[in-house]
Amino acid sequence: MANCEFSPVSGDKPCCRLSRRAQVCLGVCLLVLLILVVVVAVVLPRWRQQWSGSGTTSRFPETVLARCVKYTEVHPEMRHVDCQSVWDAFKGAFISKYPCNITEEDYQPLVKLGTQTVPCNKTLLWSRIKDLAHQFTQVQRDMFTLEDMLLGYLADDLTWCGEFNTFEINYQSCPDWRKDCSNNPVSVFWKTVSRRFAETACGVVHVMLNGSRSKIFDKNSTFGSVEVHNLQPEKVQALEAWVIHGGREDSRDLCQDPTIKELESIISKRNIRFFCKNIYRPDKFLQCVKNPEDSSCLSGI
């Protein structure tokens, strides 16, 4: 006990006192411990796992709310929708949850709030040819892609994810579906709403496919892995594929492509009829949608 000096004591008084050197050492240790606690308390909550994908789109909450308000103003049938409730449900699907463990169930409250019905024969699916599909529905106003519906419109071209066990949105990085995980907030959202969109389709459903790709029908696309398998045979009489050619000189019959035949087989096995049409000139196709009575539209497009 080299650091203790004994002296007569009574009662509960300490039997020894620390030397000045030991007191200084103890004080320094306590100070270092306090600094470490402060550093951990400040830095740890700010630490974020680095994902391979880009972070949440800037001003994500404001963008979603603004889009919701705009959509409900333009579409009278959706004016009953409370956009704050929509945002709360959207946020609740991913905030504080591990970004690689999101489920379709997480999005069900949002799906219920955004329920819409597309008239029969008016559903347009698409795969790898988004821009032309949207140009088409802008002209043919009585047909609808998923992005023409409330939920698809809210999330179109946006990225989002949260921080596990916090209420923060991660604007630095989000999981990439190839490099990190497929059960991320964005991928699961589109899988969920695409499934619902296909389930509610009826009559003749159309799909626009990109004929310039090596796989015109890709089983791994959202259309090939989700929508095709969720068309309801009791409601859908036929699927009509529009294969869009990539150039004026391409005169091939792409409806005979092996991947299109694969699509036909999948659809036929589900007791849904299948039709296919080549669209050789997409520019003329859109022009003829605008002006169907034009004499040039009487010839093939």
Swiss-Prot record:
Cystine pairings recorded for this chain: 68-83, 100-181, 161-174, 255-276, 288-297
UniProt topological domain (Extracellular) ranges: 44-301
InterPro entries per UniProt: ADP-ribosyl_cyclase (IPR003193)
Compartments reported by the entry: Cell surface; Membrane
Residues exposed to the Cytoplasmic side: 1-21
Residue numbers annotated as active site: 120, 202
Subunit structure: Homodimer.
PANTHER family found in the cross-reference section: ADP-RIBOSYL CYCLASE, ADP-RIBOSYL CYCLASE_CYCLIC ADP-RIBOSE HYDROLASE 1
Gene this protein is translated from: CD38
GO biological process: B cell proliferation; B cell receptor signaling pathway; negative regulation of apoptotic process; negative regulation of DNA-templated transcription; positive regulation of B cell proliferation; positive regulation of DNA-templated transcription; response to xenobiotic stimulus
Functional summary from the UniProt entry: Synthesizes cyclic ADP-ribose (cADPR), a second messenger for glucose-induced insulin secretion. Synthesizes the Ca(2+) mobilizer nicotinate-adenine dinucleotide phosphate, NAADP(+), from 2'-phospho-cADPR and nicotinic acid, as well as from NADP(+) and nicotinic acid. Also has cADPR hydrolase activity.
Glycosylation sites: 101, 121, 210, 220
Native organism: Macaca fascicularis
Entry's transmembrane regions: 22-43
Pfam families, A to Z: Rib_hydrolayse
Lineage, uppermost ranks: Eukaryota, Metazoa, Chordata, Craniata, Vertebrata
Signal peptide interval: none
Name assigned to this protein: ADP-ribosyl cyclase/cyclic ADP-ribose hydrolase 1
Gene3D superfamilies, A to Z: ADP Ribosyl Cyclase, Chain A, domain 1 (1.20.82.10), NAD(P)-binding Rossmann-like Domain (3.40.50.720)
Molecular function (Gene Ontology), one example: identical protein binding
